[in-house]
Amino acid sequence: MSQTNWEADKMLDVYIHDYLVKRDLKATAQAFQAEGKVSSDPVAIDAPGGFLFEWWSVFWDIFIARTNEKHSEVAASYIETQMIKAREQQLQQSQHPQVSQQQQQQQQQQIQMQQLLLQRAQQQQQQQQQQHHHHQQQQQQQQQQQQQQQQQQQQHQNQPPSQQQQQQSTPQHQQQPTPQQQPQRRDGSHLANGSANGLVGNNSEPVMRQNPGSGSSLASKAYEERVKMPTQRESLDEAAMKRFGDNVGQLLDPSHASILKSAAASGQPAGQVLHSTSGGMSPQVQTRNQQLPGSAVDIKSEINPVLTPRTAVPEGSLIGIPGSNQGSNNLTLKGWPLTGFDQLRSGLLQQQKPFMQSQSFHQLNMLTPQHQQQLMLAQQNLNSQSVSEENRRLKMLLNNRSMTLGKDGLGSSVGDVLPNVGSSLQPGGSLLPRGDTDMLLKLKMALLQQQQQNQQQGGGNPPQPQPQPQPLNQLALTNPQPQSSNHSIHQQEKLGGGGSITMDGSISNSFRGNEQVLKNQSGRKRKQPVSSSGPANSSGTANTAGPSPSSAPSTPSTHTPGDVISMPNLPHSGGSSKSMMMFGTEGTGTLTSPSNQLADMDRFVEDGSLDDNVESFLSQEDGDQRDAVTRCMDVSKGFTFTEVNSVRASTTKVTCCHFSSDGKMLASAGHDKKAVLWYTDTMKPKTTLEEHTAMITDIRFSPSQLRLATSSFDKTVRVWDADNKGYSLRTFMGHSSMVTSLDFHPIKDDLICSCDNDNEIRYWSINNGSCTRVYKGGSTQIRFQPRVGKYLAASSANLVNVLDVETQAIRHSLQGHANPINSVCWDPSGDFLASVSEDMVKVWTLGTGSEGECVHELSCNGNKFQSCVFHPAYPSLLVIGCYQSLELWNMSENKTMTLPAHEGLITSLAVSTATGLVASASHDKLVKLWK
């Protein structure tokens, strides 16, 4: 569905119908569809239990927790946080500025500069202290507060009482450091302002990764905290933040948690950014802020905190536990994107993963100038807002919010609050170069001052050390460490690009990449998960017949063509969610996967689930393997990899697929013993071929004729006419065991080859209907060399035999795999052969020169490999099928990127050189097209 063409009532009808179908209420669904004239188009957010169910369950969980505290610890924590916020607001109201604004601004600037230099050291010490010495931390906090009081009398006087309240009100949260100390201590459990490493490391990541659900609870908490006043946020303790992270998963089931999580994620970055004020905006915190805008789309009030200065943002910290989100891969819960979390985490990991930060920038770009202005205004008004409004914010998350950054970065109102910030974020232009940390610091200072002035003018709360939204740019800037600051800044630059977020039935995001910005010196590319639906392309590759583990459900969001990227589901959600990888002209890469419905609504912007894997897949500049999304040579320019269509191809597992030579048809088959031909443009079925008596293991089109052949565990090979569905043309029987693979010769139309479990290879003549040759050499998969057909690659156990087609002599025996080979594939030229085992991929040269030599090698990083295919347009890019995800390997740069794709094992891949499509078949019963 297009982003701009949708109506709320019609979309509701579509999802009600989808819910009825998912509940197997077929008669009711048909009646409702007929009477309500409901569209038959597939829903954009295809949640396993129905989008309405996942949406409703999240809110029900929070509602019931108000009457039954034991129902959900996460929900209870959420409610408790609201109470704490109310207390903090009272404290803030009682507090009065004692120092002039100018003095405060100067003090804040000085403190921030100091914090930039001291945050990391303090974070490390504080992390240890938090775990084992809460009392020591309190003492340190007091000392730091005294120092800060000297510099910022007002801020510190306000903060100690808030801290005391936090300690009293939240026994779990033992202490909250001063604005400086707080972010630092939170670094482990929350978002430490000090260093990205501190934030990422330790508690935050483990919490989120261990508990995808925790992401959702964190999101909800972060959202509330964002609404809180800056002082209020400070009052929250680190302990509370940690608890939120721990409990989030409990509060909501994976799908629900993902919904809350996405909502919280949007708000979280803002709080995190804000709380880093006195502590000095660390690139991590800044990155979070940038990310926040994307999440802010969900909740304007949440967005307000992003722009509003905040001394301490425990909630942000919670959210800031980006590690958690990323642990779950930005697509944390059922595909719900946790932009805030992932982005925060990316900020934390800036040094390690600058690209992560850039993702947050992309989110910011997605906001329109008007939305940005709204966010700024909301922040200004945030202080005056009542606590009761915070309770509504969660609902607001569900409301559609469209936010885009104007060329100036923020809307005009935003410009007022944060002038000059937008300029750094300009969509077309590059942000500040990596080295311009000084510039960023200056911008940051200016923004802080302006924000303070605006707040004072607006009346309401006294000025506080405000991490100030430091709109995307500033956020990135302040890390004492040149590298981190550079990365964050660079990412911020990448951020620069206008974008709009809209909410369709399935949230479709337009993510205008200023991926150009990503070009920035940092060289890190940010990847954003994107979900989309549409036609896809693929070419044949390996298939597997083994059972696949169950996968978690996920919901995809629609994706708009072009440079617009919609958020896909979180990896947790499952392979079902659609995902997309996009590389801007600058070579920046964005990868998105379908996000949960709520996340799609406003925060579809970014899952961050892909962030870890996608980080810099296409970045030539970074050698960091984490930057999996670095530029792939020419691939980096304008390269996109997006799911364009999906179809349930079977009632059981799908094991194989292949394109016709013209790319107009796609064939798939699997455990249901049937082969289905699909029109690739519409993915509508053309023909179903039913004659096999056991599961089909391989399916191949003839290169020159509209014929296709299938092999099966019934020990037969059958040849079919694509235009005649009545019966098979030939049935070849002769194998003594299950036939595992087959292939047509590229030139000799009459020749077909097959292999079986007994390592026997047979040549068949289609015209004569007889077996012409039998020899040993292959048992898993066989593939003829494209174009010339000189060689036949046959995998057997852990080696690949390259046989001469004419003499059947083994020309090369390619050894090097420790485990059995699952798949082999040739590049379109026939010069290179790839072999895949569960732990390794090897690429061999066979065209010219030193044949049989391994020229590229990739080891598994945790997700076992299963199938492979060379990209039809970029020969240096190998697409590898894994469990639930696709691995994109840029061999020339030795960079990899993971893209959530299915909810089961991806057994087969296929490519069409005619259309540029890539097809993936999976045990989740789906066949998807990518381009």
Swiss-Prot record:
Coiled coil: none annotated. Disruption phenotype: Slight defects in seed mucilage extrusion. Ectopic expression of AGAMOUS, leading to the replacement of sepals by carpels and stamens and of petals by stamens. Wide and serrated vegetative leaf lamina, narrow cauline leaves, large palisade cells and reduced fertility. In plants lacking both LUG and LUH, embryo lethality and abnormal flowers. Enhance the polarity and growth defects of fil yab3 and luh/+ lug mutant leaves, being partially abaxialized. Residues 1-88 are annotated as: Required for SEU-binding. The keyword Transcription applies. GO terms for biological process: cell differentiation; cellular response to external biotic stimulus; DNA damage response; flower development; galacturonan metabolic process; meristem maintenance; mucilage extrusion from seed coat; mucilage metabolic process involved in seed coat development. It is found in: Nucleus. It comes from Arabidopsis thaliana. WD repeats lie at residues 641-679, 683-721, 726-765, 769-804, 808-845, 852-890, 893-931. Forms a corepressor complex with SEU; LUG is the transcription repressor subunit and SEU the specific DNA-binding adapter. Interacts with AGL24-AP1 and SVP-AP1 dimers, and possibly with SEP3, especially when complexed to SEU. Interacts with MED14, HDA19 and CDKE-1. Binds to YAB3, YAB5 and YAB1/FIL; these complexes promote adaxial cell identity in leaves as well as embryonic shoot apical meristem (SAM) initiation and postembryonic SAM maintenance. Keywords: Developmental protein, Differentiation, Flowering, Nucleus, Repeat, Repressor, Transcription, Transcription regulation, WD repeat. Gene3D superfamilies: YVTN repeat-like/Quinoprotein amine dehydrogenase (2.130.10.10). Residues 192-219, 503-521, 529-540 have a biased composition (Polar residues). This is Transcriptional corepressor LEUNIG.
